[in-house]
Amino acid sequence: MSSTDAAAARSRAPRILCAGIIVLDEVFRVEEFPKADGKVQANKFFVVNGGCAANAAVAIARLGGGAALAGPMGGPAGEDHNGDQVLRALARENVDCRFCQRVDGLATAKSAIFMNGRGDRTIVTYRDERIAATVPADADIIVAAADAVLADNRYPDFVAPICAAARRRGAPVVLDGDRPTVEDDPLFGLATHVIFSSECLRETTGIADLGDGLRRIARATAAFVAVSNGPDDILYLDGGMLRRLPVFAISAVDTLGAGDAFHGGFALALAEGKDEVEAMRFGSAVAGIKCSRLGGSAGAPNRREVEEFLAENGLPRAAQSNAALQT
């Protein structure tokens, strides 16, 4: 990124290009999950856009960032009703969807999500695997206006060229490690930051201890690496030292899309010039507020709500966040 481009970026809200999976979510809220062959009545039902990239884009837009989305979808318009519904919802959230690629004859992914009164989830997803072979039409054009890229690893053939194009421009690339993969995944080398879910890190490395898992991944990439772990502390490596960042204590109502909200907040904060610890703390606040509300990505907070939350609950605690873990 040239000095002129950098100066222009500072004069406006950062623009984050989110790349990856796009889903239509149908969510059923029940008191208890049905037993085998049983039936239950849902007490709430809603339809919302889903998928890591799409959820993160909504979070970024609500926080005041410029949010663009790139990902393969079914098509064409008028025939793929799942995709049509998702794009209408994203347009209402001010997400730029011009780089969403529709694949004729296929259906956009769809999930049925069952959530009980304790916030536990069961998810069933239909996704036509032929969509995974889609590659971006022109990765350089897609990232031309992006100050940062946030990619999930659900469609590696689609996101890898986008990540590579962003790196050529000098833009940060945040990889959401959501799908278990191999330890030497080429996407790790294309990212400046890799943040895993605990499940993904354990399944990718085969190592139960999250700290040891991060150390294993660090052998394959020079990227900043971290792992979120639900209500427990975020772990990350700092110069090879394993450290922790406490998360906010939240009474969770709905965790759907919380990780995506965290990644969106983290990527936006990085693009705004925050360091990794500050960005993780900001992302943690975004995710925490989202968890306190029912609605999936529709529960993502705005900037004022996050700033008020941080003011009430404290900014990053250097002594605590930079203390080495005893392992």
Feature roles, as predicted:
Residues 61, 167, 271:
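Gly/Ala-rich phosphate-binding loop of Rossmann-like dinucleotide-binding domains
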Residues 69-72, 98-103, 113-148, 153:
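Conserved phosphate-binding/catalytic loop of the ribokinase/pfkB sugar-kinase fold
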Residues 130-139, 157, 175-183:
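Active-site glycine-rich loop that binds ribose-phosphate moieties when present
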Residues 160-244, 251:
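Conserved phosphate/ATP/ADP-binding segment of small-molecule kinases
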Residues 1-17, 210-327:
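Conserved phosphate-binding/catalytic region of the ribokinase-like
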Residues 89-105:
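A glycine-rich helix N-cap at a beta->alpha junction
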